[in-house]
């Protein structure tokens, strides 16, 4: 899996003084990891926002530091934003070992067309938006692709055990959980009963009797 690059620089201010670099269009960040001393760094805020949007929590990010000869492979671990204005306050990156398996939440992406879904009265049942995947960092898929064209009958159900990921990646969710199926939509038919206005008001209906003119002579 190809990573996304981001350039970082060492940070010289800490604590409440971080607001000074935020005013300059920079965001404080940290890199930490197993057996790694935490690094206090800073990033261009616009570039960092772009990286967050592209990488999410499941894409590798290649961190470039002026002091390093090699790039660092990291995942975005935590994003802190101002609760009122929403701007970035701080981001944590977790540096990984490429030889050790990692676990990540991978989004499900549906593509293709189902002949059933083109018809009225059918809908897609998809309980999950993400699945938990374990793999070596370079083998983590950016998405789990599901082709909707396979759902051509109502009997077609797709379970986690039916999904095979490339590169030795493994889905950790229970194998018998349903991932997708097409189901019929059962419409509720509402019946309207006509109510006599007199009955609705609680009054007894009055019988209308037509008087026929007598044809007999008196």
From Swiss-Prot:
Entry GO CC: cytosolic large ribosomal subunit
UniProt KW keywords: Ribonucleoprotein, Ribosomal protein, RNA-binding, rRNA-binding
GO MF term list: 5S rRNA binding; structural constituent of ribosome
Database matches in Gene3D superfamilies: Ribosomal protein L25, beta domain, Ribosomal Protein L25, Chain P
One GO BP annotation of this record: translation
Region (Disordered): 197-218
InterPro entries in the cross-refs: Rbsml_bL25/Gln-tRNA_synth_N, Ribosomal_bL25/Gln-tRNA_synth, Ribosomal_bL25_b-dom, Ribosomal_bL25_C, Ribosomal_bL25_long, Ribosomal_L25_dom, Ribosomal_uL5_bac-type
Composition bias type Basic and acidic residues, residue spans: 201-218
Pfam families (UniProt xref): Ribosomal_L25p, Ribosomal_TL5_C
Purpose: This is one of the proteins that binds to the 5S RNA in the ribosome where it forms part of the central protuberance.
Record's subunit section: Part of the 50S ribosomal subunit; part of the 5S rRNA/L5/L18/L25 subcomplex. Contacts the 5S rRNA. Binds to the 5S rRNA independently of L5 and L18.
Entry's family note: Belongs to the bacterial ribosomal protein bL25 family. CTC subfamily.
Protein name: Large ribosomal subunit protein bL25
Classification lineage: Bacteria, Bacillati, Chloroflexota, Dehalococcoidia, Dehalococcoidales
């Amino acid at each position: 899996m190809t990573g996304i690059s981001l350039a970082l620089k060492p940070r010289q201010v800490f604590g409440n003084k971080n607001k000074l670099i935020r005013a300059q269009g920079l965001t404080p960040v940290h890199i930490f990891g197993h057996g790694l001393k935490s690094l206090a760094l800073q990033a261009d805020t616009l570039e960092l926002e772009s990286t967050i949007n592209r990488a999410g929590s499941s894409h590798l990010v290649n961190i470039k530091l002026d002091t390093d000869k090699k790039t660092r492979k990291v995942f975005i671990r935590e994003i802190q934003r101002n609760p009122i204005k929403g701007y970035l306050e701080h981001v944590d990156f977790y540096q990984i070992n490429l030889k050790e398996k990692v676990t990540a939440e991978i989004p499900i992406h549906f593509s293709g067309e189902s002949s059933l879904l083109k018809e009225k009265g059918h809908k897609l049942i998809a309980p999950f938006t993400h699945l938990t995947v374990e793999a070596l960092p370079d083998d983590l898929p950016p998405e789990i692709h599901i082709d909707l064209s396979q759902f051509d009958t109502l009997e077609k159900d797709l379970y986690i055990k039916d999904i095979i990921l490339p590169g030795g990646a493994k889905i950790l969710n229970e194998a018998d959980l349903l991932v997708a199926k097409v189901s019929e939509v059962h419409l509720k038919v509402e019946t309207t009963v006509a109510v006599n206005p007199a009955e609705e008001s609680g009054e007894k209906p009055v019988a209308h009797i037509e008087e026929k003119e007598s044809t007999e002579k008196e």
